[in-house]
Design a protein with these regions (language model features):
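A cross-kingdom feature marking solvent-exposed beta-strand/loop segments within repeated
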Residues: 44-60, 81-96, 126-146, 170-173
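Vicinal oxygen chelate
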Residues: 2-7, 14-22, 64-71, 88-105, 107-174
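Long, hydrophobic N-terminal alpha-helical segment
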Residues: 2-52, 57
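Extended intrinsically disordered, low-complexity coil regions enriched in Ser, Thr, Gly, Ala
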Residues: 25-46, 90-94, 102-127, 172
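Short amphipathic beta-strand starts and helix->beta connectors
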Residues: 1-4, 80-84
Length: 174
């Protein structure tokens, strides 16, 4: 399928580059000792119920980040489950898997991209903060990050990731 002539979608600032790795400890050591990157902050994410290639999926992912100026390097190791990262690792090996940009009005951007034949292959939401602030007062909203990975087979294989931070209402269990 040939790409349709796109109507240009304006992205925000570049956030980071994502590099898929097989062994996080070796990768952190390598990027730190060879290139002087770091310190790396590492977290494990339990990703539950996200959209992946038209299905609902779950995965466990370890990510390590280190800033280089205003942009960060993200190392990604999938511990369990199938994601765009495991797909990349299986088909291409370790390496640069995505370039991420911050956007506003993500859903509008996705509609515009769809007109150009560019579709999301993975979409997930990650809660960022606790509904209670430091004083223990309940909040009515919380910050949420939505990440969308766009199909890149037609444009060389490096995915574009769109990221939107949004305040969302907190729902309390009844």
């Amino acid at each position: 399928m040939q790409l349709k002539r796109p109507s240009m979608v304006t992205l925000g600032k570049m956030s980071h580059v994502g590099i898929v790795v097989r062994d996080m400890d070796k990768a952190v050591e390598y990027y730190g000792s060879v290139f002087g990157l770091g310190p790396f902050t590492t977290e494990v994410y339990d990703l539950k119920s996200f959209a992946y290639r038209g299905k609902t999926a779950s995965a466990r992912v370890k990510a390590a980040i280190a800033y280089s100026g205003p942009v960060f390097i993200e190392l990604v190791q999938v511990l369990e489950g199938e994601t765009v990262h495991t797909e990349f690792l299986r088909e291409r090996g370790e390496g640069l898997q995505h370039v991420a940009f911050l956007v506003r009005n993500l859903d509008e951007k996705l509609k515009e991209l769809a007109k150009s034949g560019v579709e999301p292959v993975m979409r997930l939401r990650i809660p960022i903060d606790n509904p209670a602030d430091q004083a223990g007062t309940a909040k009515k909203t919380r910050l949420e990050l939505t990440e969308v990975y766009l199909d890149s087979d037609k444009i060389g294989g490096t995915m574009i990731q769109l990221m939107e931070f949004k305040e969302v209402p907190v729902t309390c269990p009844e």
